[in-house]
Each structure stands twice: as C-alpha cells, then as structure tokens.
Regions:
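A conserved beta-strand->loop->alpha-helix hinge within the catalytic CA
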Residues: 105
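ATP-binding/phosphotransfer module of carbohydrate and carboxylate kinases, centering on a glycine-rich
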Residues: 1-77, 87-90, 108-119, 131-142, ...
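Short beta-strand segments
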Residues: 15, 79-83, 146-152, 156-158
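Conserved A3 ("GATE") glycine/threonine-rich loop of ANL adenylate-forming enzymes
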Residues: 20, 127, 151-154
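Structural signature of FAD isoalloxazine-binding scaffolds in flavoprotein oxidoreductases
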Residues: 170-173
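Short loop/edge segments at beta-strand edges and connector loops
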Residues: 121-123
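A charged helix-plus-loop insertion that forms the helical arch/lid used to bind
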Residues: 91-102
Length: 321
C-alpha cells in the first residue's frame, strides 16, 4: 500500500473470482500499473447473485472514496474482470455458473455507483492474459497463448498487444477441447474435455480418490510426485499427457510464438513444465514449437489487467475526441 499521491490519473481495478474479489487503485507510474492500494473481500456467493453484485458495487464505491480522501481527486476510470460469458460491447455479464448470475448490466450499475465514471468490463482469463502479455511473461511477444490451469481451464489469445475475444466472446475456451473421447464427464456436458482431465480441480479430485484424503488438492498431488509416490506420478503423467494434447491442438490452430501457463497448477514449477515441454515436443510434427513459460504476475494478473482495461478505455476516449 502506498499513500503517495499518483503522478497523474489513477484507476479502480477489480478482479471478481468465485470466492473473493481482489481490488486495487492503480496509478500510472512505470508501466502504468503502479499498485497504490490493494484490498480483498469475500465474493458472498452464499447470498445469491444479488449479494455478489452488491459486493462488487460496494467495494468499488469504497475504493473511489478512499482515493478521493488520500489523493484529493477521484479515479479516472474503472476496469473489472469477471468470469463467465460476457457481452463486452454492452457491458453485460451474461452468465457465470460459479456466481449464479444472468444478464447483469454490470457496467451500467458500476458507472451509476461511481458517479458516472467510465467502466471497462472484461473476461477474467483474457484480462489476466492482457496483463501477462503487456507487462508479464509475454511482454514484447507478438503472438501468445495464455492458459490458466485452475479449477477449470481457459485461455486467452494475444495478438500484437490485444486479446482476441472471438465473434461471440468465447474465444480461448481450451478447457472444452475433447482430448479423450468417452473420458470423464465435464461440467459442460461433454466427456473427455481437457478441463476434466488436466485442470487443478481434476488433478486434485483424482489424487483425493487415490490417496483417500478427501481434502487433498493438486498441490498435494505435486508434493506426492516430488516424493516419488507411484500413484501421484501416474495421475500427474495422465494430466500432463492430456494437457499436451490440448496445447498441440491449440498451437496447430493459432501458431503462437509463446505459450504462457498460469493458474494454480503452474505453481508446481518444473514438476509441471519439464514433462509438459517434453510431451508437447513429442507430439508436434510440422508445427513450430513455441516457448512454454510460466506466468510472471501470479494472482495479481487479474487486477493489473483490469487496470489496463481502464487505461485502454481512457485512451480510446481521448483518441475519439
């Protein structure tokens, strides 16, 4: 936290997750992503979608008030990253299973709560990918693919400093590439999806079943691999093989120069990256092998990306005048 007044405009940044909201005030020092103040709060899913929305509006309002009190001027804009399906042109959060909402006019609600402030809305994984591409592991790379391995799996396609949302806002849903036809059932209704086999959630469930520890997760599986537990090694090898299959499909279609891997499973470090690089290399034929690197920004990527969205919005407004 810093109480130093920002050198110029600062923005509100929100990263809304299934369990918590990460929020920050971001100044324009250095790369334009100077963290001036950070806070976190529970998402309050138990209270239902209305409570989730009110929590977002409340923390945004608190950040605006804090900024005015500390710096003597209000924020210039706000950026918010949310999960699920978005209609970015209208600023509508169309659907998010983990938050329970449908067709929430989130940009309008935030603009109203923030006294008319311009608000940018973005998909959480694409927003994290934006930050990694501009100021993180993909900085200076013209074509990259950011893949988040968390409870699920999703990707973001980076092209010359911007993220490609697709025609309907669903580009990069790598988790629902079928890599094992007839495999485990996925939440989307298909079987054998990458997400059902290689996400941190899938690895954690497999290790919990194998170890008999119902509270075990992917991090426990990684530690067991380090300890040369044969059961964990088999589970890990299966997940890495599935992930390599999904990545080769993606690089065949997209031809990225760099693949950036983030999310909880990436925290395993070389336990993941060494066999994954080998598995991808073994599968490619005519494709150019990309660099496969860990994400650099950790769980700050979403907030930093939301700040970049807000700054892009300001830049667009200036250029349109």
């Amino acid at each position: 936290m810093s109480l130093t007044p920002p050198k110029s405009q600062y923005v509100i940044a929100l990263d809304v997750g299934g369990t918590r909201i990460k929020a920050a005030l971001i100044g324009s020092g250095g790369s334009g992503t100077e963290l001036l103040y950070e806070t976190r709060r529970a998402t309050d899913r138990e209270g239902g979608p209305d409570a989730v929305v009110e929590g977002i509006l409340d923390v945004a309002g608190q950040l605006r008030t804090y900024g005015i009190e500390q710096y003597g001027t209000g924020p210039a804009a706000a950026g918010v990253a949310v999960p699920g399906i978005l209609d970015e042109p209208t600023g509508t959060a169309v659907y998010a299973a983990n938050l329970g909402w449908r067709d929430v006019p989130l940009r309008t609600l935030l603009t109203r709560r923030l006294g008319g402030l311009p608000v940018a809305l973005g998909h959480d994984v694409r927003t994290g990918g934006l930050a990694e591409g501009r100021i993180g592991a993909g900085k200076g790379v013209d074509r990259f693919l950011f893949v988040a391995l968390g409870t699920g799996i999703a990707g973001a396609i980076g092209i010359d400093g911007r993220l490609e949302p697709g025609a309907h806002g669903s580009a990069g849903e790598l988790g629902h590439i079928v890599v094992r036809p007839g495999g485990p059932e996925c939440g989307c209704g298909q079987r054998g999806c990458l997400e059902a086999l290689a996400s941190a959630g899938a690895v954690g469930r497999a290790w919990a079943a194998a170890s008999g520890d119902v509270s075990a997760g992917a991090a426990d599986a990684a530690r067991a691999v380090e300890s040369n537990d044969d059961r964990a090694i088999a589970i890990w090898r299966d997940a890495v093989d599935a992930l390599a299959a999904g990545l080769v499909t993606a690089l065949t279609l997209l031809d990225p120069r760099t693949v950036i891997i983030g999310g909880g499973l990436a925290e395993a470090g070389d336990i993941l990256f060494v066999p994954l690089r080998e598995a991808v290399r073994a599968r490619v034929t005519f494709q150019q092998l990309p660099m496969i690197v860990p994400a650099a920004l950790g769980d700050a990527a979403g907030c930093l990306g939301a700040g970049l969205l807000a700054r892009d919005l300001l830049s667009a407004e200036v250029s349109s005048r």
